[in-house]
Curated annotation (Swiss-Prot):
The keyword Cytoplasm applies. Its EC number is 2.5.1.19. GO terms for biological process: amino acid biosynthetic process; aromatic amino acid family biosynthetic process; chorismate biosynthetic process. It comes from Streptococcus agalactiae serotype III (strain NEM316). This is 3-phosphoshikimate 1-carboxyvinyltransferase.
Length: 427
């Protein structure tokens, strides 16, 4: 498709879709709790629909009237063996988190995914879940999907130091630990998004957190709840960046999630000199309205504990850095290599084709700004965040056309993205 280019000013108000991470977890917790869970503002992207379909196949009654998703949970014990393979599509979150649920079930399941998911590492969950007593086999010695998983009712507690900073692995182990008899201890390498921990408490469970240590007991009773999902800050990130880099822009983003483990982009933008204000803060839901204005930006250095707080935003932050004065360095971000694509390689190649001065490193990238961008023909590579980054980059192109193929990947997390983009440009 031909993307919109040569944007002068963007003004408007957007309500971004529900947070993908929270939507997945709300569906899972509703399905493993006793009683009725009602969820408002769920993201209805392809990834979350994979999670919903998986639990439907395991016997959970889930209804969607277009506004509210209602789940009639019967607890872990109410799950039944699916008749077919569980197809997780493109969703690594679905596969890893649901593997934790399945580890304590006494039936065999095979989980499959699309071509992209079939290249993503699963040994990071297979190893600890196997230590707990589940049997997991995949391609190349448990490394890759499809995954065949045989759970057990005799799942053992675990003491485990996460070798990578991964909220998905942490969450899989939490779901497994809930099905054990005894106390588990999970130690994070760096603190990652804590939606699973927050939601356990919301559903009536308990866990102790001290620094990077999480302790929880198995056998807890979870009870269905009413949940409102805030907007996804990872989706809002595209509008934050476009508001900062297109002259005279003024964009208002309503109901954006501001969980402290996810707001790294706000800290980085502020450090770079970006004008962004928070208002209408809801401390219960952890959401706020963000107002973004065009800004003159300075380069920065992003590394260490900051990386897990903005790992999904790094592609669009790389674009932001092309429009900042000076050299921006992103380091300690090797986890980007095992996302839907090798995001270090694909971000660098895509922005280079558009004229950016950007270099890949072993664990990140170096971006020298400020550089104009030019026309190019590009591909999403099956990665929703790459597609959206390119669509925002195209707005900076003054002459010629930017062609994007594979744009359907954007439906993974933001089905209305291109429609919202057009609305801002034409406002």
């Amino acid at each position: 498709m031909k993307l919109l280019t040569n944007a002068n000013t963007l003004k408007g108000t957007i309500r971004v879709p529900g947070d993908k991470s929270i939507s997945h977890r709300a569906i899972i917790f509703g399905s493993i709790s006793q009683g009725v869970t009602r969820i408002v503002d769920v993201l209805r992207g392809e990834d979350v629909l994979s999670t919903i379909e998986a639990f439907k196949q395991m016997g959970v009654l889930i209804e969607d009237d277009g506004e509210i998703i209602t789940i009639y949970g019967k607890g872990f014990a109410g799950l039944t063996q699916p008749n077919n393979l569980l197809d997780m599509g493109n969703s690594g979150t679905s596969m890893r988190l649901i593997a934790g649920v399945l580890a304590g079930q006494e039936f065999e399941v095979t989980m499959v995914g699309d071509n992209s998911l079939s290249k993503r590492p699963m040994d990071r969950i297979a190893l600890p879940l196997s230590k707990m007593g589940a049997r997991i086999s995949g391609v190349t010695n448990r490394d890759l999907p499809p995954l065949k998983l045989q759970g057990t009712k005799k799942l053992k507690p675990i003491f485990y130091h996460l070798p990578v900073a991964s909220a998905q692995v942490k969450s899989a182990l939490i779901f497994a630990a809930l099905q054990t008899k005894g106390e588990s201890l999970i130690v994070e390498k760096e603190q990652t998004r804590n939606h699973t921990e927050d939601m356990i408490r919301q559903f009536g469970g308990h866990l102790d957190i001290k620094d990077k240590e999480i302790r929880l007991n198995g056998g807890q009773s979870l009870v269905g709840q009413d949940i409102r999902v805030p907007g996804d800050i990872s989706s809002a990130a595209f509008w934050i960046v476009v508001g900062l880099i297109i002259p005279n822009s003024h964009i208002i983003l309503e109901n954006v999630g501001i969980n402290e483990t996810r707001t790294g982009i706000l800290d980085v933008v502020s450090k770079m000199g970006g004008k962004i204000k928070l208002s209408s803060v809801d401390n219960q839901v952890k959401s706020a309205t963000l107002t973004v204005d065009y800004s003159h930006l300075q380069a920065t250095h992003i590394s260490g504990a900051m990386i897990p707080r903005l790992i999904d935003e790094l592609p669009i932050i790389a674009l932001l850095a092309t429009q900042a004065q000076g050299t921006t360095v992103i380091a300690d971000a090797q986890e980007l290599k095992v996302k839907e694509t090798d995001r270090i390689q694909v971000v660098v190649e895509s922005l280079k084709q558009m004229g950016a001065d950007i270099t890949a490193t072993a664990d990140g990238m170096i971006i020298r700004g400020n550089t104009p961008l030019h026309a190019a023909s590009l591909d999403c590579h099956g990665d929703h965040r790459i597609g959206m980054m390119i669509a925002i980059a195209a707005l900076l192109v003054k002459e010629g056309e930017v062609d994007l193929s594979g744009e359907e990947a954007i439906n993974t997390s933001y089905p209305n993205f291109l429609e919202h983009l057009e609305g801002l440009v034409n406002a």
